[in-house]
């Protein structure tokens, strides 16, 4: 699943490719992907000009002026731009024809991606309803707020970080990396974390997601950016996908286990489980 660094990389690519372009026609092959009114989606988008491409957590925000097209890539979603003819592909589901003759295509093998066309004035309410946490930046991701939320919850720390309420943008790859860097076992109850662990989790979340953006995201499975290029963050992953390899910190073999139904990579020596 694309996580914050991958979505930010896609955002940057899309802004390069389609900024200022007018949408002249839209073809939708999988109606269930649109979560707002279908008729409004089909009739309103033609004539709209793409003014910017933003991001909030794992959501892409295609700014159309008074409206925003909110796109979530879910497991396998990606965007491709074709300058003229679009090849046949059963996984191409949404086609945005642009005035310059090119077509922006949304591809999704799993068909889990979503689109919401909403008024820009409703954007804050849209994310408030989903209880989306702050962006992982020092200016917005406040340590005291993070600490208070953790200490009031019995939820295991990995599922808690994944639910997007504490901080926006973490997924399975980067949560494993953050927990390893902070030396925290993923099954530790949030309320049992001490102040030093909480600070490490906070600081490593900011650092690791920023590094992921710098490296263009992690190309594992099928991720590519909007320009069709791989990311390089996979070369910097310390524990995710490293089962059986030595921990970069202590040399103990990395193990894989299930936490909250998710495959999870840890160093059993550095991330000891509390009794």
Curated annotation (Swiss-Prot):
PROSITE patterns: FPG_CAT (PS51068), ZF_FPG_1 (PS01242), ZF_FPG_2 (PS51066). Its EC number is 3.2.2.23, 4.2.99.18. The keyword Transport does not apply. One of its GO terms (molecular function) is 8-oxo-7,8-dihydroguanine DNA N-glycosylase activity. GO terms for biological process: base-excision repair. The active site is at 2 (schiff-base intermediate with dna), 3 (proton donor), 58 (proton donor), 262 (proton donor). Binds 1 zinc ion per subunit. A zinc finger (FPG-type) spans 238-272. Pfam families: Fapy_DNA_glyco (PF01149), H2TH (PF06831), zf-FPG_IleRS (PF06827). Keywords: DNA damage, DNA repair, DNA-binding, Glycosidase, Hydrolase, Lyase, Metal-binding, Multifunctional enzyme, Zinc, Zinc-finger. InterPro entries: DNA_glyclase/AP_lyase_DNA-bd, DNA_glyclase_Znf_dom_DNA_BS, Formamido-pyr_DNA_Glyclase, FPG_cat, MutM-like_N-ter, Ribosomal_uS13-like_H2TH, Znf_DNA_glyclase/AP_lyase, Znf_FPG/IleRS. DNA binds at residues 91, 110. Transmembrane segments: none annotated. NCBIfam families: fpg, PRK01103.1. PANTHER family: FORMAMIDOPYRIMIDINE-DNA GLYCOSYLASE. Belongs to the FPG family. This is Formamidopyrimidine-DNA glycosylase. The lineage of its organism: Bacteria, Bacillati, Bacillota, Bacilli, Lactobacillales.
